[in-house]
A protein has these predicted regions:
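Conserved beta-strand-loop-alpha-helix junction that forms the acyl-donor binding cleft
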Residues: 121-131, 147-152
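Conserved hydrophobic beta-strand within the GNAT/NAT acetyltransferase core sheet
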Residues: 86-88, 119-123
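Conserved catalytic core of Hanks-type protein kinase domains
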Residues: 31
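Terminal substrate-recognition subdomain of acyl/acetyltransferases
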Residues: 2-6, 154-165
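Alpha-helical elements of Rossmann-like donor-binding domains used by nucleotide-donor carbohydrate transfer enzymes
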Residues: 27, 50-53, 102, 106
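Conserved acetyl-CoA-binding loop-helix of GNAT-fold acetyltransferases
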Residues: 96-113, 128-136
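Acetyl-CoA-dependent GNAT
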Residues: 15, 19-23, 34, 38-95, ...
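Conserved acetyl-CoA-binding loop of GNAT-fold acetyltransferases
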Residues: 135-145
Length: 165
């Protein structure tokens, strides 16, 4: 079974998760420049060259989430040793329609079926919308943590396995 980052697309009931590529760079730069997206990503913004670098990182696969043939969001799957996790967002106009839980569940099931022992997410505790979306996708809260080198605020470790999905 190929990884989605190897060109494989993953379908949910409402969404298609496909690898992000060069053709998506300007779209991803624009999305990250939107204050309603950036605030959930520690206000990170990127130039096109910086985005290309991000898309080419080792250990991280980047994806575009599509609904009804239109790009509506971003997911990334990262792997470090036996640990692996997802991060993602939807553009503001796509929120509240169940698209992120659908896309995240589809990608998590694919990764778990491909050998990942579990998939984690780490939303900030203040991001109730994300926590609810991850719960709807099948992720279960495991623990809460203070800010650290990777998190600017208190965050929640949530886990999913084939048993919870």
């Amino acid at each position: 079974m190929g990884l989605p980052g190897d060109g494989v697309e993953v379908r949910g009931e409402l969404t298609l998760v496909r690898p992000a590529g060069e053709a998506d760079v300007d779209l991803l730069v624009a999305w990250h420049a939107d204050p309603e997206v950036a605030r959930y990503w520690d206000d990170e913004t990127f130039t096109p060259d910086e985005m290309r670098e991000r898309l080419g990182r080792d250990g991280v696969d980047s994806f575009i989430v599509e609904a009804e043939g239109e790009p509506v969001g971003y997911l990334q799957a990262w792997r470090s040793g036996v640990a692996g996790g997802l991060d993602g967002f939807l553009i503001p106009g796509a929120r509240g329609r169940g698209l992120m839980p659908d896309a995240a569940r589809a990608l998590a099931v694919f990764l778990l079926a491909g050998g990942w022992p579990e998939v984690t997410v780490d939303p900030y505790t203040w991001n109730d919308r994300a926590i609810r979306a991850w719960q709807k996708a099948g992720f279960v809260e495991h623990s809460r943590h203070p800010p650290d080198a990777d998190h600017s605020a208190e965050w929640v470790l949530m886990r999913a396995s084939l048993r919870t999905l």
